[in-house]
Amino acid sequence: MSLFEQLGGQAAVQAVTAQFYANIQADATVATFFNGIDMPNQTNKTAAFLCAALGGPNAWTGRNLKEVHANMGVSNAQFTTVIGHLRSALTGAGVAAALVEQTVAVAETVRGDVVTV
């Protein structure tokens, strides 16, 4: 069974992604990366990316992550903070600890594409 299925499918990933961005927007250390961004659209794009990355349907049509983040100046510390917000959203949704860590491990695979400083 895929991580996508274990998490509860599309609706669960969408809900976790919405909470993930709520957590980010409440954190001044990373919220500024999303100033002026259409957050409902961003949430949908990220949920589609996560669905595909977690073994679900591949409806993600976003741009290359390395290109998107090239000029953002994201540090390792900021990426770690964002991963913490993902972990918190998953935990808050009642996801089992082992599944949280497996999901975080998938998210960690893009660190090299997102971190630029």
UniProtKB/Swiss-Prot annotation:
<comment type="subunit">
    <text>Monomer.</text>
</comment>
<keyword id="KW-0007">Acetylation</keyword>
<dbReference type="GO" id="GO:0046872">
    <property type="term" value="F:metal ion binding"/>
</dbReference>
<keyword id="KW-0408">Iron</keyword>
<keyword id="KW-0813">Transport</keyword>
<feature type="modified residue" description="N-acetylserine">
    <location>
        <position position="2"/>
    </location>
</feature>
<dbReference type="GO" id="GO:0019825">
    <property type="term" value="F:oxygen binding"/>
</dbReference>
<keyword id="KW-0561">Oxygen transport</keyword>
<protein>
    <recommendedName>
        <fullName>Group 1 truncated hemoglobin trHbN</fullName>
    </recommendedName>
</protein>
<keyword id="KW-0349">Heme</keyword>
<dbReference type="GO" id="GO:0005344">
    <property type="term" value="F:oxygen carrier activity"/>
</dbReference>
<dbReference type="InterPro" id="IPR001486">
    <property type="entry name" value="Hemoglobin_trunc"/>
</dbReference>
<dbReference type="InterPro" id="IPR009050">
    <property type="entry name" value="Globin-like_sf"/>
</dbReference>
<dbReference type="InterPro" id="IPR019795">
    <property type="entry name" value="Globin_bac-like_CS"/>
</dbReference>
<keyword id="KW-0479">Metal-binding</keyword>
<feature type="binding site" description="distal binding residue">
    <location>
        <position position="21"/>
    </location>
    <ligand>
        <name>heme</name>
    </ligand>
</feature>
<feature type="binding site" description="proximal binding residue">
    <location>
        <position position="69"/>
    </location>
    <ligand>
        <name>heme</name>
    </ligand>
</feature>
<dbReference type="InterPro" id="IPR016339">
    <property type="entry name" value="Hemoglobin_trunc_I"/>
</dbReference>
<dbReference type="GO" id="GO:0020037">
    <property type="term" value="F:heme binding"/>
</dbReference>
<dbReference type="InterPro" id="IPR012292">
    <property type="entry name" value="Globin/Proto"/>
</dbReference>
<comment type="similarity">
    <text>Belongs to the truncated hemoglobin family. Group I subfamily.</text>
</comment>
<dbReference type="Pfam" id="PF01152">
    <property type="entry name" value="Bac_globin"/>
</dbReference>
